[in-house]
Amino acid sequence: EIPLRLVGSEMCIRDSYSEMKEFFPNNHVEYFVSYYDYYQPEAYVPKTDTYIEKDSALNEQIDRMRNAATRNILENNDVIIVASVSCIYGLGDVESYAAMTLPLAVGDNVEPRDVYKRLTELQYERNQTNFVRSTFRVQGDTLDIFPAHYEDRAWRISFFGDEIDDIYEFDSLTGKKTASLQKVTVYPANHYVTPRPAISQAITGIRKELAETVENFKNNNKLLEAQRIEQRTRFDLEMLETTGHCKGIENYSRYLTGRKPGEPPPTLFEYLPPNALIFIDESHISVPQIGGMFRGDYNRKKTLSEYGFRLPSCVCLLYT
């Protein structure tokens, strides 16, 4: 069983995390909260005709901890998750996330270029000069990978032709070897990573809804809204086709995860096993808070769809 402790207050969650680490020193105690230092959601105010573009500042440390949390849920049984109410927001599909992993083992026969390509598909960036989290670099027959869940450690993969000859862990700052490894598994750098076939299928569904939405706006003499939704969605589709990602990709979650209209999006709860235990701290505060988050998100997205900033399917992206 994997326990999840849901804490309503962002201030109290740090204390809860420290307590769990102290009570269970031999367990994988993980921290899962919103990874934004600053977050301004996309919104539209009809009264003043004001469109507010999504703006945010990502906290790298918390993003690393979120990646460590989902990875350990899938790999270990001794995991305890301390989470804030933000865990009810949509997260990438767990099946796609797990399917996109890249296992590497000593003795594997694999073309190095194929490994580089797969890392790019996992949203890892090739960077020869600035070796940081979620990047990789190549030096001759050596590949260095800085996993998304690590803070100061990385992996070195040595090739001999098309065979993996050696794998070891090293300190990312000093380069000192810290452990010899027989195998590693690289998890996606982003929870919204989606396999290419799923992206192609999603694009087909998005185009169909776009055509229906444009026609509906035109039939109701809402020409500005029709032009707006067509222009914005087509740009997103181009980005999805070329890079597999786009700004505001969470608004297309229904298609990327293959859900039906009205079905809730995957969240952290989908990553947990069926026998997981969930504890809600101060439920008299946390539960109403969740309800308020639901209503606020619903109204915001409904307005965006009514005025042609987003497709109607974005309103389905509500948490359970």
Language-model segments: residues:
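N-terminal cationic and glycine-rich segments that engage phosphates or anionic surfaces
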Residues: 35, 39-81, 85-318
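Conserved Walker A/P-loop ATP-binding site and its immediately adjacent core
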Residues: 9-20, 36
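Hydrophobic/aromatic pocket-lining and membrane-interface residues
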Residues: 5, 20, 82
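Conserved RecA-like helicase motor-core motifs
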Residues: 26-34
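Single conserved hydrophobic/aromatic residue that forms the stacking wall/gate
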Residues: 1-8, 13, 319
